[in-house]
A protein has these predicted regions:
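Active-site gating/metal-coordination segments in enzymes
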Residues: 36-37, 45-123, 171, 175
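Conserved, mostly hydrophobic/aromatic
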Residues: 7, 30, 51, 83, ...
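Mobile, glycine- and charge-enriched loop segments
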Residues: 1-16, 54-64
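Active-site environment of divalent metal-dependent phosphoester hydrolases
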Residues: 11-14, 45-48, 71-72, 99, ...
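Hydrophobic faces of well-ordered beta-strands that scaffold small-molecule active sites
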Residues: 4-8, 38-40, 63-66, 90-94, ...
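Catalytic pocket-lining loop regions of alpha/beta-barrel enzymes
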Residues: 104-201
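Mid-to-C-terminal alpha-helical segments outside catalytic/metal-binding sites
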Residues: 1-6, 17-37, 197-199, 212-245
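A general structural detector for well-ordered alpha-helical segments in enzyme core domains, enriched
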Residues: 22-29, 50-54, 79-83, 107-111, ...
């Protein structure tokens, strides 16, 4: 069954993670798992060039995200405009945990305003206190109702945060969910049925997780075959089609 991946990285993560993947390795993995195209970002705000190189080396395989750090101020905003307008990037990646800011902090406003002006989505890491909690992401969605926000990991590994991700997405129609790293397969079905059949996306978070692990969560979620196809493919296809130039 063909798939689209809503979240993956290219590059090396050192320290505790100790994982890495090249663009070539990622494409090989995609081919093996029938993943046609991937929403791709680098490892941080200092190596967006890796995403650009992957997009150039493998045309039509990636939607590129600008990994942005709002604490870098105007430098980050200008990089967003440059990569979106001149290098065909399709959105923004934020990680409040990595860069140590709260997900609804005012320092995000210039980045969110850029997303609104450029008509691009924002993908944001969720699930870790105190920076990346679903309630804070919901406040950001409330402040920018005309910017679509994808809550990566939909609360991640904590049951309370997973539940909050679903509750907040039900409250704010511009919040979407991506399920990589989230361990509860039943919550994929719950999101499909209660948040919206088109607002839950399959993702891998490569190289942190192998696609087959994430695939099994969708396959065993209790969804029908048609619904599984939505999560694996149609939902992200429809979502990203809004932003095609």
């Amino acid at each position: 069954m063909k798939k689209l991946d809503a979240h993956a990285h290219v590059g090396t993560f050192g320290g505790w993670a100790n994982v890495a993947i090249t663009a070539e390795e990622l494409v090989q993995q995609m081919d093996a798992c029938e993943i046609e195209k991937t929403v791709l970002c680098s490892t941080g705000s200092d190596d967006n060039f890796r995403t650009k190189e992957a997009m150039e080396a493998y045309p039509n395989h990636f939607w590129g995200l600008v990994y942005a750090n709002p604490l870098e101020g105007e430098k980050s905003v200008q990089e967003i405009y440059d990569l979106v307008q001149n290098k065909d990037f399709s959105g923004i990646k934020l990680n409040p945990l990595r860069h140590a800011y709260v997900a609804d902090a005012e320092c995000l406003d210039p980045i969110m305003e850029a997303a609104r002006e450029l008509h691009i989505p924002v993908f944001i890491h969720s699930g870790h206190a105190p920076y990346a909690l679903p309630w804070s992401i919901a406040l950001l969605a409330e402040r920018f109702p005309d910017v679509n926000i994808v809550m990566i990991h939909m609360g991640h590994g904590h049951g309370v945060y997973i539940d909050a991700a679903l509750k907040m997405a039900r409250r704010y129609s511009n919040l979407y969910l991506e399920m990589s790293g989230m361990p509860m397969n039943s919550k994929i079905k719950e999101a499909y049925e209660t948040v919206g059949s088109d607002r839950i996306f399959f993702g891998t978070d490569a190289p942190f997780h192998h696609p087959t692990i994430e695939m099994q969560k969708v396959i065993t979620s209790g969804l029908t075959e048609k619904e599984i196809e939505d999560v694996f493919y149609h939902n992200l296809q429809k979502f990203m089609a809004q932003y095609e130039k």
